[in-house]
């Protein structure tokens, strides 16, 4: 398995093993019952499969805050059966207060940090001709070399045209016992 994280605004934060990230998004999909289809699409499609557009940054923040609140009422035991045996044994998510919000606090915090960096860099560097800066959206990405360097080269149009699993998940292989 390999590690993945969030990248945005020139900041990369490695968060977890790919199977844990996959479980994070599956739990969001399964337990975000109070979200509208449009709100769920911001996280369940834009963040999971594509990237967070600048115009969606604030709405994505609000949706994630709602999900985090919802996760604060759900036990970490909801992860049972969602992680391969190896990840259950070595699971860093088990050292929490017992809620999904605590288990995935690193995920929520990393997304927020990358959103903040993307917005700060855009404000600071845009309009300065010597930089020719463009918004660097938040994406889920492989965080180990050389995967990170390869994934970093994927164009936004490739993300926009993506059909099927996200790029960060396409390299997952099943382990044989």
Language-model region placement:
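Acidic (Asp/Glu-rich) sequence patches and key acidic residues
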Residues: 1-177
């Amino acid at each position: 398995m390999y590690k993945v994280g969030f990248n945005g605004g020139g900041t990369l934060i490695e968060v977890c093993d790919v199977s844990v990230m996959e479980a994070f998004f599956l739990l969001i999909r399964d337990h975000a019952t109070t979200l509208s289809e449009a709100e769920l699409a911001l996280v369940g499609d834009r963040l999971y499969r594509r990237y967070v557009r600048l115009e969606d940054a604030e709405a994505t923040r609000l949706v994630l805050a709602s999900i985090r609140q919802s996760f604060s009422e759900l036990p970490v035991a909801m992860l049972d059966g969602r992680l391969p045996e190896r990840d259950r044994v070595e699971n860093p998510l088990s050292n929490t207060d017992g809620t999904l919000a605590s288990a995935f606090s690193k995920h929520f915090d990393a997304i927020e940090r990358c959103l903040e960096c993307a917005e700060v860099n855009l404000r600071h560097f845009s309009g300065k001709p010597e930089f020719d800066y463009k918004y660097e959206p938040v994406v889920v990405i492989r965080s180990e070399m050389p995967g990170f360097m390869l994934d970093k080269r994927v164009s936004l149009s490739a993300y926009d045209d993506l059909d099927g699993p996200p790029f960060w998940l396409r390299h997952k292989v099943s382990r044989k016992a």
